[in-house]
Amino acid sequence: MKSRNLLILAITIFLGITQSSCNYNAFVTAEEEVNKAWSQVENVYQRRADLVPQLVSTVKGAAEFEKSTFEAVTEARAQASSIKLDPSQMTEADLQQFQQAQDNLSKSLGRLMVTVEKYPDLKATANFKDLQAQLEGTENRIAVERKKFNEAAQSYNTMIRRFPKNLLAKIYGFEKRPYFQASPEASQAPVIEF
């Protein structure tokens, strides 16, 4: 009778350890999906940052006196490129700071494109058209990769918050991941005047 109770206890402990390790592995897999998605976000933002100097130099040749616009784009690019985040340590505040820097670069690029409207000869050049198409494609990829990051973070966050896995997640130190959110300006419809 005593050996039977020991056997049941040993099996219960073994199953508990096995279940715990399976949950841990699931947490690690989900966390790595978030890290992978973040790497792709950084990749497309870097692609955009790499296009900016080419775009600025192309426009600069045709619009020499638009110096303040070029400086604003260059400064915004430098700021956006300087923020590096570790996805495993990322907080809501870190992500907001990163997003703000990227939003500033987007706004500066928007002002640059408005400046270009004053120069029809520049808009007609093949080099500018190519750079503009690449930038538009990159902006679309940014939106896609941000969405994928949010999906991976949502899946991970759901996993670590569901009972009973949330108990193990706390023991193992798995923390909630932040999401990309729309900038405050996105909630306001743009004013279009004809």
Please provide the spans of the model-predicted regions.
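A helix-centric hydrophobic-segment signal that preferentially recognizes long
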Residues: K2-F194
